[in-house]
């Protein structure tokens, strides 16, 4: 028992779904394993009227991240005395439902030129390594005596993307054609490191107001175009060449990009300027 207690005390970050010896546990609450799931329904139909082709559909996703939300965000449930959390002040988060319409349109303007347009909304879960944390790790974050660069998130929303495309196909020879497409993509609700402004000094559970959390609040935009040259198969030879240019911009390239600014509190405001993201690949 003494060895177990000592091991438990030395393992300050704790774990989810396993005990201190690495054995799987099947229990409820913060110490139990998480079982996220996604349920999806997609309906699509195509309508043709002469040379005009319309493709319309809708996708419905129901995301269950199997995570938690705070009953009172202004008073996070830190149990300072027992070095843990008040689990009765944390409840299961709700399933998030996202409806995503999709629409495509194509029509010819001459015998050689065809225009096409597309619009769609897309949704996905945040990265699952961001929201989850054990009660021991929550204790470290809320106590404020340790710098925790990878804290936890509560009740995160799905990340949403809206995408537009417009382009044309031009058959300039009987066996050769070019495709030119311009696209724009806007992603919102991306996860970023932040604080809860609701938590004030002197809150009920004495939680450090500068405690960090993952929240939805960042965005990125991607604009660009794609040029494709293609030929039909002639004497068992077919040519296909494509070039894509894209420009990805946003405030933070990573959920933890804001960590340095937050660690300086009010001395260093969070980044607000839109910049090229470090993973952008223009060509």
Residue ranges, per PLM feature:
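Transmembrane beta-strands of outer-membrane beta-barrel pores
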Residues: 2, 49-51, 60-66, 119-125, ...
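Outer-membrane beta-barrel channels and translocator barrels
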Residues: 49-52, 108-110, 161, 173, ...
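Gram-negative outer-membrane beta-barrel transporters
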Residues: 183-186, 198, 204-283
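Flexible, surface-exposed loop regions and adjacent strand-edge segments
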Residues: 2-15, 70-81, 85-86, 131-140, ...
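Transmembrane beta-barrel architecture of outer-membrane proteins
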Residues: 36-42, 98-101, 151, 161-165, ...
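Membrane-embedded beta-barrel scaffold of Gram-negative outer-membrane proteins
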Residues: 114-116, 120, 126, 130, ...
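Transmembrane beta-strands of outer-membrane beta-barrel proteins
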Residues: 1, 54-58, 115-117, 166, ...
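Signature of Gram-negative outer-membrane beta-barrel scaffolds
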Residues: 1-112, 126, 130, 144-146, ...
């Amino acid at each position: 028992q003494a060895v177990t207690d000592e091991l438990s005390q030395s393992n300050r970050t704790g774990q989810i779904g396993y005990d201190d010896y690495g054995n799987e546990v099947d229990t409820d609450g913060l110490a139990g394993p998480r079982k996220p799931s996604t349920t999806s329904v997609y309906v699509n139909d195509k309508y043709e009227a002469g040379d005009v082709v319309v493709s319309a559909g809708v996708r419905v996703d129901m995301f269950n991240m199997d995570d938690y939300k705070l009953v009172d965000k202004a008073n996070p449930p830190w149990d300072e005395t027992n070095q843990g959390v008040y689990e009765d002040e944390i409840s299961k988060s709700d399933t998030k439902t996202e409806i995503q319409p999709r629409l495509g349109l194509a029509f010819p303007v001459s015998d050689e030129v065809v225009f096409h347009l597309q619009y769609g909304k897309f949704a996905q879960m945040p990265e699952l390594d961001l929201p989850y944390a054990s009660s021991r790790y929550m204790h470290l974050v809320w106590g404020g005596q340790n710098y925790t660069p990878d804290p936890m998130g509560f009740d995160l929303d799905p990340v949403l993307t809206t995408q537009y495309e417009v382009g044309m196909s031009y058959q300039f020879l009987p066996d050769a054609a070019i495709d030119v497409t311009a696209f724009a993509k806007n992603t919102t609700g991306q996860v970023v490191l932040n604080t809860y402004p609701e938590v004030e000094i002197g809150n009920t559970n004495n939680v450090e107001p500068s405690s960090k959390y993952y929240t939805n609040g960042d965005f990125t935009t991607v604009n660009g175009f794609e040029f494709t040259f293609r030929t039909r198969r002639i004497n068992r030879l077919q040519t296909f060449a494509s070039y894509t240019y894209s420009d990805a911009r946003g405030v933070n390239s990573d959920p933890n990009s804001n960590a340095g600014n937050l660690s300086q509190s009010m001395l260093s405001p969070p980044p607000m300027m839109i910049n090229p993201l470090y993973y952008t690949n223009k060509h």
